[in-house]
Every structure is written in C-alpha cells, then in structure tokens.
C-alpha cells in the first residue's frame, strides 16, 4: 500500500513539473527537484524517473539559440544529480544515472572573462553512470557503456565499454547491463 502511494505521489508531482519540463508521457518525480530553465528547453520521454535533489539547468545566454536538455524514454536521474546545459545535452533511452552525478557541458566561467565555452554532451542508449561520476563537456558515451563510480569522463567512451578512473580510461569491453539481446551479444563479441 505504501509503495503504491509513493508511486501515485511521484506521478502527481511529475504533473506539477510539466510547467517547467516538456514531457512525452508520465514522469515520476520522487521528491523536490530544482529546475532552472532560462531561454532553454528541458524535454523528457515516457516513463522516466527523477529522484530528490536532482538539479536540471537549461540556461542559454542567448534568446535566439536556446539550450536544449533532452532525456529519452525509461531513463532515471538519481538523487542530487546535477545536469548543467548551456547548449545541448542529449541523454538516450534506458539510461541509468546514479546519485550525485555531475553532467557539465560548459565551464562555469572562462579565463579572462570571455564567453563561456559549451560543448554538447551525448549519452547514448542503455548507458549506466555510477555514483559521483563527472561527465565533462564535449563527451559522447557510446551505447551500452558503463561509467564507474567516481570516474571523471573527459574523452569519448566507445559503445559497450567500461570506463573508470580520474581521468576515466576505457578499461574493457562489456556486454550490455540491460540484459542480453542478439545485437548486444554481437556487439560485445567484437
């Protein structure tokens, strides 16, 4: 009964956040989150989950070119995870982001006071990002990859790869954490 009530309240809370987030379907919000949307757009797919303390920022300095933060279907944003977007952050379907993760596609300031440089981040489908990982600007994380806890990702990660460390290094090829399918097994065998 208690679990059912928790899910109902999460869906109702998700409906309340529709004024700041465009949602393709029902999104569960399991507690208070921080959404800042200035000259930008935040899009969520169907059946996503957002956990307490998450911070979603889509903040463009230019009204003509708005920032776009997109999260695909069935993805999960963990407790206290922060996603900062000045240009474009794209998160695919079935992505699991653990708690305290930072996804930062820009430096918060630039040396000498010039314009802040932002570079898009792409996190492809079926990626699992471990606790307290940091994903920095200009990175693409390939389909089915796993990012280890505490990793600092500064370079692209190929599909079906485990990456960890500071800075993150590609450690080994992996099978998809989502389960097995013909495509996943063929990819992992390469």
Language-model features and meaning:
Residues 1-104, 124-126, 143, 159, ...:
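Domain-scale signature associated with acetyltransferase and cell-envelope carbohydrate enzymes
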Residues 67, 87, 119-120, 131, ...:
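Glycine/small-residue-rich pyrophosphate-binding loop that anchors the diphosphate of NDP-sugar donors
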Residues 84-85, 132-146, 151-155:
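Beta-rich strand-turn-strand
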Residues 101, 108-109, 151-152, 158:
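Flexible glycine-rich beta->alpha loop in the catalytic core of nucleotide-sugar glycosyltransferases
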Residues 107-108, 113-115, 139, 173-174:
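Conserved catalytic-core motifs of eukaryotic protein kinase domains, centered on the activation segment
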Residues 162:
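Short glycine-centered segments of the SAM/dcSAM-binding site in methyltransferase folds
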């Amino acid at each position: 009964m208690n679990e059912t009530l928790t899910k109902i309240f999460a869906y109702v809370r998700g409906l309340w956040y529709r004024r700041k987030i465009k949602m393709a379907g029902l999104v569960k919000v399991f507690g208070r989150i921080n959404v800042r949307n200035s000259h930008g757009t935040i899009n969520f797919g169907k059946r996503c989950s957002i956990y307490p303390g998450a911070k979603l920022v889509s903040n463009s300095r230019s009204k003509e070119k708005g920032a776009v933060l997109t999260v695909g279907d069935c993805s999960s944003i963990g407790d206290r995870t922060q996603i900062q977007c000045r240009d474009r952050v794209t998160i695919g379907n079935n992505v699991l982001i653990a708690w305290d993760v930072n996804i930062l596609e820009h430096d918060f300031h630039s040396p000498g006071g010039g314009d802040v440089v932002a570079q898009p981040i792409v996190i492809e489908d079926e990626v699992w990002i471990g606790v307290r990982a940091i994903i920095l600007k200009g990175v693409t994380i390939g389909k089915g990859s796993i990012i280890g806890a505490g990793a600092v990702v500064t370079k692209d990660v190929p599909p079906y790869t485990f990456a960890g460390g500071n800075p993150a290094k590609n450690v080994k090829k992996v099978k998809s954490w989502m389960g097995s399918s013909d495509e996943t097994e063929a990819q992992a065998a390469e």
